[in-house]
């Protein structure tokens, strides 16, 4: 199996780094695309259009977070079966995961499209950007089936330790997205509709690339005969692994929506500042997220092989990698935050100075707390990979409570400065839960293994 990577053998640090690097590069590429997309929208359509795209970002985090989290959860039993070398069982999980994901895709797409405008009203979307925000969000909801398809199939590939191919697919999809942005927005002049259509088509393209690759190179994943049968127990385990992970993102998303709703009430300038800062923040924080994703596969395979000591060694290695990266971000963000934010606005705009100053402040405050975020992602994904998604979901509840508290009490007093502390307070709250939770899970697994 030349297209797979057994993470139960070899040096843990090397395995984690080799798996995480393509993920990190892929997501950085995605975030660069999102930054380019926001820059195109902000500079060529206007600050109002940038705010319209950003006004729905927290909603998309909730919806897409549920989709992506669920798909990541569905891949955990597959990674564990692969680690245990039980390939027939692995393929049966693949067949049942496809069924569950199809149902989720249809239900979510129908419901979100029907309630699109009502959702925007709930988050206090300013009236002057409501129409553009509605058009963009509706197109994003139509993208849900393709997003689920890509994340599910890419999750299957990563469960086998192969993170390179999904990275290549992200490169292709991101390049297509940028080309479509230029064509639809700058050439044809479609406005925010062009940005939405470009995203939809590029997601479809990435899903098709996964299908072709699996059929050609990873036939070990393709179910045959009785492996295709519906199995209640497997569906139950998939739901038990996937739904809590999906809900974790959605619960976290509720807190982010509360925070964005409080920020939206401050006015269009602050919506634009929040949008610009979040775009760049995700560019830097996706590294932490993908170290965590690597840990989920690493822990999943090693639990399947019952090599529990490798899990502790892997977590320690991941923390050291995270701290080294944090030092790098400090050297970039602290001195250059203002310059990065200037890419999103037309300097001739009367509001450009306020947008840049507030967005840069958001970036610097968040940067101080990146080690807290890094520990959060490492422990959360490790717990998920070890098969305890319910506990990781509870950390999302802690984040939600923290962000809601900031939205209700801190933002009214300190305005945008309060918004800047929404994420750090949430990260600290989650870590206070995850540290003892990880210790509990590891000790429980050791006890059962003995």
List each model region and its residues.
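Short alpha-helical transmembrane segments in multi-pass integral membrane proteins
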Residues: 1-20, 78-143, 187-243, 299-368, ...
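Interfacial/gating helices of multi-pass transporter permease domains
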Residues: 41-61, 127-132, 192-193, 234-241, ...
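Short runs within selected transmembrane alpha-helices of multi-pass transporters and secretion channels
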Residues: 71, 139-158, 166-174, 195-208, ...
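Hydrophobic transmembrane alpha-helices of multi-pass small-molecule transporters
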Residues: 62-65, 109, 177-182, 207-211, ...
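Transmembrane helical elements of multi-pass membrane transporters/channels
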Residues: 18-37, 139, 173, 202-206, ...
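Small-residue-rich hydrophobic transmembrane alpha-helices
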Residues: 50-110, 147-166, 273-337, 373-395
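Helix-terminus/linker motif at the lipid-water interface of multi-pass membrane proteins
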Residues: 32-50, 120-127, 183-190, 250-283, ...
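N-terminal transmembrane alpha-helices
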Residues: 7-44, 58-73, 77, 102-109, ...
